[in-house]
Amino acid sequence: MHFMKKYLLPILVLFLAYYYYSTKEEFRPEMLQGKKVIVTGASKGIGREMAYHLSEMGAHVVLTARSEEGLQKVASRCLELGAASAHYIAGTMEDMTFAEQFVLKAGKLMGGLDMLILNHITYTSMNFFRDEIHALRKAMEVNFISYVVMSVAALPMLKQSNGSIVVVSSIAGKMAHPLVASYSASKFALDGFFSSLRREHGVTNVNVSITLCVLGLINTETAMKATSGVFNAPASPKEECALEIIKGGALRQEEVYYDSWSWTPILLGNPGRKIMEFLSMKSFTFDKLISS
């Protein structure tokens, strides 16, 4: 108790004051002008809206999704909105070779890469988990493993540009929900992996930011179909959600919260976890690993 009063509580107060009241840089659309950006899951929903916002800001975009017809329409609209360039490559993120090669091809098309926005998912219906190991494996591969594969492929280019990785996740990856066990597992995996990778970047002085976007229910066709009749909550607009994701990536924020409930970022932002992460870093010795 004495330790808490003397040390832990003052640290907590200082941390909270800094976290909630520190001056943050304001977003400006010019931040994306001429930037080279990959957007996955871009044929519809949040991905499509991000592609449109980026185009209005004058970015170069390379888009991917499974639907070539959908991508063609989105890319054409991107050029109309003012994209510096707009390309697309259709394919499935179940194929890890495609995931890797897409990033490399996109980099060649744009002559580099400034921002990798990972937004794709495999469709998962809401139901009780019983023995659907195949569905669990597919969710982990598409929603998580492919994100890692693409990040690994993109890192050499992002290191050159001091760029950003933007990972679109979910509240289901921060707190337990029923009926979405496989989906939730893949989203928790994103938080664990990319939050750890962010800490490693800090230790090794890699100037590539990682932004985890924690979303509530968004009014995309896929989400509305999946939740119909089993989950009743107000859905937030995909257009505004897409813009908040881009802002968070451009400002190099660690996390972005977007949900209809205003208390979500306060309750899930979890300053206690951040304090524990900060304190735990003092237990590691990295010299041997860095020099090897």
UniProtKB/Swiss-Prot annotation:
Q: Where in the cell?
A: Endoplasmic reticulum membrane
- Gene Ontology terms, MF aspect: 11-beta-hydroxysteroid dehydrogenase (NADP+) activity; 7-beta-hydroxysteroid dehydrogenase (NADP+) activity; oxysterol 7-alpha-hydroxylase activity; steroid binding
Topological domains annotated Cytoplasmic: 2-7
Principal place of residence: endoplasmic reticulum
Q: Which pathway is it part of? A: Steroid metabolism
Which keywords belong to this entry? Endoplasmic reticulum, Glycoprotein, Lipid metabolism, Membrane, NADP, Oxidoreductase, Signal-anchor, Steroid metabolism, Transmembrane, Transmembrane helix
- Give the EC number(s) listed in the UniProt record: 1.1.1.146, 1.1.1.201
**Which residues carry out catalysis?**
183 (proton acceptor)
Q: Which InterPro entries is this protein grouped with?
A: 11-beta-HSD (IPR051253), NAD(P)-bd_dom_sf (IPR036291), Sc_DH/Rdtase_CS (IPR020904), SDR_fam (IPR002347)
Residues exposed to the Lumenal side: 25-292
Sites carrying a glycan are 162, 207
Membrane topology type, per the record?
Single-pass type II membrane protein
Record-listed substrate binding positions: 170
| Binding of NADP(+), residues | 41-67, 92-93, 119-121, 183-187, 218-222
What do we know about how this protein assembles, alone or with others? Answer: Homodimer.
Described function: Controls the reversible conversion of biologically active glucocorticoids such as 11-dehydrocorticosterone to corticosterone in the presence of NADP(H). Participates in the corticosteroid receptor-mediated anti-inflammatory response, as well as metabolic and homeostatic processes. Bidirectional in vitro, predominantly functions as a reductase in vivo, thereby increasing the concentration of active glucocorticoids. It has broad substrate specificity, besides glucocorticoids, it accepts other steroid and sterol substrates.
Q: Which family is it part of?
A: Belongs to the short-chain dehydrogenases/reductases (SDR) family.
Family annotation (PANTHER family): 11-BETA-HYDROXYSTEROID DEHYDROGENASE 1, HYDROXYSTEROID (11-BETA) DEHYDROGENASE 1-LIKE B-RELATED
Protein's name according to its UniProt entry? 11-beta-hydroxysteroid dehydrogenase 1
Q: Which organism is it from?
A: Mesocricetus auratus (Golden hamster)
